[in-house]
Amino acid sequence: MEDLLELAIHGLTLGALYAMVAAGLALMFGVVRLINFAHGEFYMLGGYAFWYAYRELGLPYPVAGLAATGILSAFGWAYEHTVIRTILARTWHVQLIATLATSITLTNLAILVFGTQPKEVPTALSSTILEVGGVRLAWQRLVVLAAAIVIFAGLEWFVARSKMGKAMRAMSQNREACAIVGVDVQQVALATFAISAALAAAAAVLVSPLFNIFPDVGALLTLKAFAAVIAGGFGYVRGAIAASFLIGITESLAAGYLSYAYKDAIAFVFMVLVLLVRPHGLFGRRIGI
């Protein structure tokens, strides 16, 4: 029973990681109608920014985390302003090639700057173990879960209540109508990419004390987040979050009770099974984010 609880909590931690990355990916597609295959590199860059601020500059964990998140939010803004705005009106083939090229470029730049050796970011919380009834967990995992709840609640409030969030919802339903009634669609797109990059960076800040950062960490993460977005319903943020947690828990249980070798295949098996039963995702066909 203790093993099951440990695996379940580990799965929730993985789910929180996938959900923060997948939520940004779903937000981008829902609002801008573009699949960003360089999205995992936002996580990678956020992890390196956090590592540098925390280990090299010696900043406190919260300060280093906020700095990394802010830097990546600015990077997401610049990425939309330069790369995405240039290709948005082009065919999906051009968009695919451009975002994949960005992913490869960022990965190789990370190798040049940081090397190929994984970077460790141990914290006091990641090395402190909580033991309750035979269940042993690093405090960092509980921090990840608590922070994820706060982040998703904040995202929900922002999308539902704020002026920019309402503009995002409107743009996800009809971009042309938004432009006609005076919504600044370019500013909405900028905000969408800035928020999505910040979500990926926040995931890196929270999870890198548990998992190392290395240059190509974003590649597989992008694919798993993409699987969660498809399983949850393309462009539907809540669906992507729910699917991410289901994938994380299933992945952890499969690694614990079957074989660790099958772990990375779980997300894609889950996606295929969902699409066989519900072709439009867990929550069916939806309009908007």
Residue ranges, per PLM feature:
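Membrane-interfacial amphipathic/re-entrant helices at transmembrane-helix boundaries
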Residues: 1-20, 49, 57-64, 90-97, ...
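Single transmembrane alpha-helix segments in multi-pass membrane proteins
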Residues: 4-54, 79-94, 231-237
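Helix-loop-helix "hairpin" substructures at the membrane interface of multi-pass membrane proteins
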Residues: 14, 20, 136-214, 237-242
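Transmembrane alpha-helical segments in multi-pass inner-membrane proteins
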Residues: 18, 58-70, 190-200, 204-205, ...
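Generic alpha-helical transmembrane segments of integral inner-membrane proteins
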Residues: 20, 24, 66-78, 101, ...
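Alpha-helical transmembrane segments within multi-pass membrane transporters and channels
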Residues: 25, 58-103, 109, 242-247, ...
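Glycine-rich phosphate-binding loops of nucleotide-dependent enzymes
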Residues: 33-37, 57, 72, 121, ...
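Transmembrane helix-bundle core of multi-pass membrane transporters
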Residues: 86-161, 188, 253, 258, ...
